[in-house]
Each structure stands twice: as C-alpha cells, then as structure tokens.
C-alpha cells in the first residue's frame, strides 16, 4: 500500500510541477460570417484545414451538455479526470459479451485530442490518464466541457459543435433543437461512421441517436421529448456568399462575425451584374463591381468585387472594391463643393468652357468641343473638363489634395506632383473611397468610414460645410428630362439621384457613383488587367447599370431634395446669362441658392446698356435722345465668343461704333484683356533666341491687343490670335493693352537653358 500511495504522491507532485496546459495552443479556429439578419455567408477553414468554430459554453444549449454527459460520462462532475467505475463498467460489458463501452471520461477524451495521443498503446493510455489529471487540476469543469465541445470530431474535417451545427443544420449551436442535439451527440464516439455527410452514415447516426433518445426519455422529462422522433432534416451546408466581402472580413478576425451586409440586396445586385455583363459581352464587357452603402449609418449593404469570383479568365478573385484606378471625372463634384464652400460659385454661376492653358498644362474636354460658357450645374452634370480644372486652380491643389487624404484616399505623392490633373482622374482611388466620399455629401459634409461589422463605432469628421455639401448634391440631383445630351433615355427612371459618371484615360474604366434615397451606390466596369475598350464610357455603360440597380432596390418614391432648416442658405434672383445679380436690363432671370456671407455675387458687368443710333443701328458715342435709344447687350470676352462660334451658337453681338469714340472715357468701361498665357508668376525655361507665345482674351468691344515687355512694344495681335516674340532673360513684366486703353499686367521669369 505504501508503494502505491507513494506512486500516487509522485504522480501528483509531477503533475503539480508541470506547467499549466494550454488547451488551445495547437489549434486555430475558423470564422463564421453572418449578414445583418443572421444569415450565414461563409465558414472559413482553420489553419490546419478544419472547420472548427469556437463557441462559448453559454452559447451551447443546456440540453446538449446534458446529452453529452448522459452518453459519454455520467460521472463527469464526480471524478478528477479518470473514472475507476468507468473502467470496471467497460470491463464487465466486454466480458459479458454486451456492447463495447469506452472507459474514457470527457476529460480523457479531451486530453487525447489536445495532445494528439495514440491511446491504443499502453504508454499512450498512461499519458492520457496523466494529462487528464493535469487538465482537471488546472481547469474547471465548465472550461473542460467548453474545450471538448470546441474540439470534438464531427466527421470529415468538421470539429466542434459550432461548425457542426452550421454545416449540418445551417444554424448556430444555440439554436439547436433536441433531435439535432441527439444527432450531433453520438458523432464524436465514431465520427467516421456516424457523421451526416451522406445517406449511409446518416442511417448509422439515426440508429445511435435512437439509443440515446431512449436513455434520454428515461432520464429527463423535457418539453421537446414529443418531437424526438420527428424526421431530421440535415445536409452539408457550406455557403460562400459575397466571397470578396467575407474574405476581407476573415482576413481581419475569426470567430462568429455579424456584419452589416444584407444578403437579399447582395444576391439581387450580384444577379444584376451577371445579367448586365452577359448582355454586353459582344462589346467586350465581362467584368463589373458594385458597392451599396446605407448613408444613415455607413453600413455596407452589398459588396460585389467582380462579376464572377470563380472565373479566372476575368481575374474574378481580384477585389474590385479595394483596387485603385483612375476615377475619370467622378471626383469633380468635390472640386465644386470646395468652390461652393469658398464662395467662388453658386449653382448658376457662369463658367467658361473655352480652350485654356494653365502654365504648360492644356486640358481638353472629352468630346474635344467647347460650350463657350455655361452655368456651374450644367458644367458639372455635363462633365466639362475646362471649368473643373479652372475651379481646381482657384480652390487650390493643396486644399483638394487634403480633402482626398482626409476622406481616406491613399496618396503617396505630393499635391504638386498630381497638380491640376487631379480634376480629371490624375489620382487613383478605390470604389470604397468613392462610396465614402459620395456619402459625405448626403451626410452634410461629414466624413465617416464605411462600416463592415455590426458593432463598428465610427468617428465623424466635418470636411465640407453642410451648405456646400447640400448644394453639390442639389446640383447633381436634377430632373432627368432637364439634362441635355444624355446618352440614353433616362426619362423613364422613377427616382431622382445625385449621380456622376467617370471615364478613365484610354477607356480602361467606366464609373458611376451617386446618391438616391438613403443609399450611396458606386458601380464600375472594366478589366483588371488594364486593357482598354472603347465601350468603357461612364455615361454610356456604367450609368445604365447604376439605374438598373437603383430601380430594383429603391422604393420608387419622389426624391425631391428639400433644404434642411438649419442650413445658412437663401435664394437670390440672378441674371441667367451671366450668373450675376439681376439688373433691370437682364433679358432672362432665374433664382438660385447662395450662402449668405460666403458666396460672392456681383452686379453684372457682362450685360450692359449702350446707346444705339436709331437711324443706322450702330453704337453711338453718347446717349442723345431722341436720336438714340438704350439697348441691352452681353459683352463676352473674345475667347468665349470664339467658342460660341465654333459651337455654332448664334450670339447677338454689340454693333460697331458710329464714329471714333476711343477718346471718350465713358466707353473705356468693361473688362481689360485677360492674359491667358503665360500664367502670372510662372517660370519659363527657354533656349537662346527661342520665342514664347503671348495670348489674351479681350472684351467683346475690343479688336486689337498691344503687347509690351518691360514697357517696350513687342507687337500687336487681333482678338483670338497669338503673338510670338523673343523675350529677354530674367524677371520681366508683360502688359496687354486693348484698343480702348484697358490693360492688364503679369510678371514672369525667363530662365536660360542650353
């Protein structure tokens, strides 16, 4: 006896000296991703290719714990890891010829699993017993049960009750009913033969579960006992919905993850993308992506990274939501937002759309034509490049760059590097970036990052004034039948959306991003390998897809924007032709919103009353009634008049003077010539004897420009013409004087290069 007691004491001391065992250090766990309504999207594999989902003991039904102990270890709460009575009972059963019974306790089974023991050998069985005693010493019964439920084998590569309940019954463990619990309880004892992976094994499972049900009825009076004999519906349920989305989520965390995704919307939009790309296959359109966001809480409701995740020919596993590409014109609304915020424009401000140079940068419009002049809303919705670049120059490249950075756009170069090309897609952004930025407009200028998990908390940043954000959305949110030059019939679309298209350089990407109801939607079509396709035009290809999706998920209600009461906005009457404050001689007037104290609106100096000689119809030097009468004319600069002419727009010009009035001071009113090239304070590098081009836009009543360099006459040019001249090196002053004596001056530096 002393020897036996000494042996037990030695074993106990050895167990005490061993470090506390880590039950999970050899195991990794899967992740289960759910949508906002609890629908399973995906169960991932663990690092060792198992479906093993950690489930806390409180999420495992009490009945499952009772059934396990009834079936495997009735004395669980009364032993220290090893049950001598169990060994005796197993031996008698074997000697008596009855059913073979295992002598292993739950703790011993856990020890075998955790330490991967071969318990068919004497050494393995001894280590199993010692490890069981060690586990019992360091862990509570609840912790042991939890570990067992999370690592027990349930057939194939399915381990743990959490993964088994999802895969076999498509529901989390806490929702298991009694028949399902019985079916799962009997699997770990013989997982190869009793799992639910096929019909033959399901029959073996049913037989074993039937024996357990009999014992259960004898041991427990349960409200669900009457349902124990109902047919059990099971199968193998391994969904893979929203594959780009779930893989992104699972790369960040494991376990049970409840996301913001809406499986119904995800499925609907996925099917729309599949149909739409199939319809356009003949045009070489095979791939598309879309993201839908709820502006109210920034929840990502749908996330489709490609038209077909499983199609390697289109590189379908590339995530189009996070991929960075040129957005074309899709960022223009935010340049306008900054201009509105700075008071530079209002929705009906007139902007020039004429050939323009900005230093050595000479952008063109997409269609290589020019409108001459148009209001800011038209310039934005018709996506004119020149007005956008002009506004970016005025608001400042750095300010726009900062807005992009603050909105989450990852820019690895300086604002100076990107320059004015930022207005036309010169920076790369992701669909995720665009979705967050357009939602900013709907949220009063407050930026919030996208929300992927149900428990995400967001921090808002005010990046644009609420007034500027509203006016930008207002400018984009026009009645469709008021939009000119739409490439497709949009009048049938029920909803009013604030939307903008984009086409990247060389036709590689077609975009549409916009806001409708409480949603922000961004769609993209293109190729992940960067190949171009003339079909990839935002307004022709992406906009119809945008509206097809919006029609399917919207509520088909009238979405007229109303001005929130707290905004500092008012309406003012303006002269429609000029965008300036209306005067008595404006031919047409209109009302527009402006921001009191911010928006700079001046009296019109384009519309002017001039004296007309009644007899000849020519312009008189003075108003001398009754031989003259006052008439209103618009005095556009020569560059605008030239663009009008090229666009075939007939324009009523002021008539020529009746006689020479150049010495009369009253007629020196109007605009001085605007020097369009070179830019003020620019630095130009020239080789010796090389010339520079001087160009200016004079007022409508001027026909000649006289050029002076450092107060010396360099030459003269007609309106719309260029003067080539060789300048001196160093700092020089250039003066342009029109034939009515009005002048403007710039300073530049000429640097000599060999």
Spans of model-derived segments:
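Short pre-catalytic segments that frame enzyme active sites
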Residues: 32, 39-53, 163, 190, ...
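Soluble, non-transmembrane domains of envelope/secretory-pathway proteins that act on or interact
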Residues: 1, 12, 34, 220, ...
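A penicillin-recognizing enzyme superfamily signal
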Residues: 259-282, 292-294, 303, 311-320, ...
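N-terminal type II signal-anchor transmembrane helix
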Residues: 1-36
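Non-catalytic, structured segments within soluble enzyme domains
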Residues: 12-13, 99, 103-267, 271, ...
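Conserved catalytic neighborhood of penicillin-recognizing serine enzymes
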Residues: 93-120, 236-240, 244-248, 296, ...
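Active/ligand-binding-proximal structured segments within catalytic/core domains
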Residues: 59-92, 317-337
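Residue-level preference for non-acidic, small/hydrophobic
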Residues: 38, 68, 110, 144, ...
């Amino acid at each position: 006896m002393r020897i036996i007691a000494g042996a037990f004491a030695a074993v106990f001391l050895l167990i005490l000296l061993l470090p506390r065992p880590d039950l999970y250090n050899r195991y990794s766990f899967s992740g289960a991703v759910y949508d906002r309504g609890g629908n399973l999207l995906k169960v991932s594999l663990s690092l060792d290719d198992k479906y093993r989902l950690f489930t806390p003991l409180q999420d495992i039904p009490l009945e499952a714990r009772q059934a396990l102990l009834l079936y495997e270890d009735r004395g669980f709460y009364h032993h220290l890891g090893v049950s001598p009575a169990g060994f005796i009972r197993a031996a008698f059963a074997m000697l008596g010829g009855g059913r073979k019974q295992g002598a292993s306790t739950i703790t011993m089974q856990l020890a075998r699993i955790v330490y991967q023991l071969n318990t068919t050998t004497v050494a393995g069985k001894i280590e199993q017993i010692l490890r069981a005693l060690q586990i019992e010493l360091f862990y509570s019964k609840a912790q042991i049960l939890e570990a067992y439920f999370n690592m027990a084998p349930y057939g194939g590569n399915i381990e743990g009750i959490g993964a088994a309940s999802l895969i076999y019954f498509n529901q989390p463990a806490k929702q298991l009913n009694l028949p399902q619990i019985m079916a799962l309880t009997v699997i770990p004892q013989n997982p190869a033969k009793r799992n639910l992976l096929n019909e033959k094994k399901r029959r073996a499972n049913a037989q074993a579960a039937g024996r357990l049900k009999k014992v259960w009825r004898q041991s427990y009076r349960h409200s669900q006992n009457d349902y124990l004999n109902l047919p059990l519906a099971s199968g193998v349920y391994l969904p893979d919905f929203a594959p780009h989305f779930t893989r992104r989520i699972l790369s960040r965390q494991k376990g049970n993850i409840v996301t913001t995704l809406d499986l119904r919307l995800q499925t609907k939009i996925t099917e729309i993308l599949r149909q739409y790309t199939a319809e356009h296959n003949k045009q070489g359109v095979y791939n598309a992506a879309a993201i839908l966001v709820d502006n109210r809480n920034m929840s990502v409701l749908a996330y489709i990274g490609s038209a077909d995740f499983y199609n390697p020919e289109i590189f379908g596993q590339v995530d189009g939501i996070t991929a960075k590409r040129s957005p074309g014109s899709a960022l223009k609304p935010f340049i306008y937002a900054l201009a509105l915020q700075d008071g530079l424009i209002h929705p009906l401000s007139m902007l020039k759309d004429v050939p323009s140079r900005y230093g050595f940068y000479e952008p063109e419009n997409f269609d290589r034509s020019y409108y001459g002049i148009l209001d800011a809303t038209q310039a934005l919705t018709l996506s004119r490049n020149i007005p956008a670049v002009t506004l970016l120059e005025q608001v400042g490249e750095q300010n726009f760059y900062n807005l992009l950075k603050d909105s989450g756009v990852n820019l690895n170069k300086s604002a100076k590097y990107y320059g004015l090309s930022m207005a036309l897609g010169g920076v790369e952004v992701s669909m995720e970036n665009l979705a967050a930025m357009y939602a900013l407009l709907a949220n009063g200028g407050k930026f919030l990052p996208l929300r992927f998990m149900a428990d995400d908390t967001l921090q808002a940043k005010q990046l644009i004034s609420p007034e500027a954000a509203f006016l930008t959305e207002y400018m984009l949110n026009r009645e469709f039948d008021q939009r000119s030059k739409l490439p497709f019939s949009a009048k049938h679309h029920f909803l009013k959306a604030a939307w903008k298209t984009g086409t990247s350089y060389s036709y590689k990407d077609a975009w549409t991003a916009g806001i409708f109801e409480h949603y922000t939607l961004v769609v993209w079509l293109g190729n992940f390998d960067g190949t171009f396709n003339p079909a990839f035009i935002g307004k022709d290809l992406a906009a119809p897809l945008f509206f097809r999706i919006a029609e399917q998920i919207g509520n088909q209600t009238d979405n007229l924007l109303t001005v929130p009461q707290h905004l500092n906005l008012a309406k003012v009457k303006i002269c429609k032709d000029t965008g300036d404050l209306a005067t008595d001689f404006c031919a047409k007037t209109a009302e527009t919103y402006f921001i009191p104290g911010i928006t700079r609106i001046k009296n019109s100096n384009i519309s002017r009353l001039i004296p007309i000689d009644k007899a000849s119809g020519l312009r008189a030097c003075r108003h001398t009634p009754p031989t003259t009468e006052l008439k209103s004319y618009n005095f556009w600069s020569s560059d605008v008049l030239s663009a009008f002419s090229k666009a075939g727009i007939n324009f009523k010009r002021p008539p020529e003077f009746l006689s020479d009035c150049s010495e009369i001071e009253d007629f020196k009113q109007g605009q001085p010539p605007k020097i369009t090239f070179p830019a003020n304070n620019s630095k130009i590098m020239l080789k010796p004897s090389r010339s520079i081009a001087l160009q200016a836009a004079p007022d409508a009543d001027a026909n000649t420009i006289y050029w002076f360099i450092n107060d010396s006459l360099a030459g003269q040019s007609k309106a719309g013409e260029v003067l080539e001249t060789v300048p001196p090196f160093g700092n020089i002053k250039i003066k342009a004087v029109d034939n009515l004596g009005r002048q403007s001056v710039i300073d530049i530096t000429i640097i000599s290069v060999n």
